[in-house]
């Protein structure tokens, strides 16, 4: 996925280029540069790019184009339209300039703004600390699940602690109102803006229920870390992992596995047989 970089990309990309593995997940980060640190005066240092990584098909996985900078000095990713096509050992087309694209893409669900606040606020860890005092023992990582009762208890705890969060839509609406006021539209359309603002105002009860499944996953993760540490958290997370499920599906279907590794023309012929 997007957190996979450097060595992970080189290994997975090489296996893909040699048609020795089927990749499942999201596109990787795209770090294809070799950098070496150099010391500077006054305890400073700088990383100097020494070379680039190229994998068996001849492609480079580097995503950010540092050779072409914008007017403000910033850099951008190489657009897909400017990437080149390369071929695996069996003739499957693959592209450079943007990390490793898996053979089976599994989209990651979007994370609402509220979830970021829950993950960075101490309210989650504080609740689990209290919860653990009432639950000296819990089920194994393979069997443990957060109940609806636990979810409701956490929601009530958040209310009592006056948990608050900002929403991007609310910020954008505020900016839009300022622009509308500057351009003279607020006098005529203030009622419309007020109505929209009311709908976009954070509602903890509504937003908790709307994101119930993701919040229960967060709670489960925090509880697992407290009782079974990182290993237990990982074992528990595999119970509901779309990437793992797809990988097991592909591994359990030899025909699909082989067809995925074939060149497009041959794969089409095989599928029709």
Feature roles, as predicted:
Residues 13-21, 49-51, 69-79:
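Short secondary-structure transition/capping segments
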Residues 1, 14, 22-24, 45-52, ...:
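Soluble periplasmic/extracytoplasmic beta-strand elements of cell-envelope proteins
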Residues 5-6, 18, 24, 41-48, ...:
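Extracytoplasmic
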Residues 60-61, 65-273:
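Conserved functional hotspot residues or short segments at active or partner-binding sites
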Residues 2, 21, 45-46, 78, ...:
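Alpha-helical protein-protein interaction elements
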Residues 31-35, 55, 61-68:
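Short, positively charged
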Residues 1-41, 52, 236:
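Cleft-lining beta-strand/loop regions that shape enzyme active-site pockets
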């Amino acid at each position: 996925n997007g957190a996979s970089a450097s060595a992970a990309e080189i290994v997975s990309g090489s296996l893909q280029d040699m048609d020795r593995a089927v990749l499942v997940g999201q596109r990787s980060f795209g770090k294809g540069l070799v950098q070496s640190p150099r010391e500077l005066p006054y305890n400073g240092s700088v990383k100097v790019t020494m070379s680039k990584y190229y994998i068996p098909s001849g492609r480079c996985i580097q995503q950010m184009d540092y050779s072409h900078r914008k007017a403000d000095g910033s850099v951008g990713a190489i657009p897909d339209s400017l990437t080149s096509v390369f071929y695996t050992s069996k003739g499957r087309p693959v592209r450079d300039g943007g990390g490793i694209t898996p053979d089976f893409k599994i989209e990651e669900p979007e994370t609402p703004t509220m979830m970021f606040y829950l993950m960075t606020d101490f309210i989650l860890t504080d609740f689990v600390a209290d919860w653990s005092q009432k639950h000296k023992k819990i089920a194994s990582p393979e069997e443990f699940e957060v109940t609806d009762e636990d979810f409701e208890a956490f929601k009530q705890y958040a209310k009592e602690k006056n948990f608050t969060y900002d929403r991007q839509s609310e910020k954008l609406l505020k900016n839009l109102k300022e622009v509308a006021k500057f351009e003279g539209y607020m006098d005529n359309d203030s009622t419309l803006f007020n109505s929209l603002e009311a709908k976009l105002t954070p509602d903890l009860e509504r937003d908790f229920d709307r994101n119930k499944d993701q919040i229960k996953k967060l709670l489960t993760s925090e509880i697992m870390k407290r009782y079974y540490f990182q290993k237990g958290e990982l074992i528990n997370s595999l119970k509901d992992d779309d990437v793992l499920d797809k990988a097991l599906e592909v591994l359990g279907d030899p025909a699909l596995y082989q067809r995925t590794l074939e060149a497009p023309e041959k794969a089409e012929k095989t599928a029709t047989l």
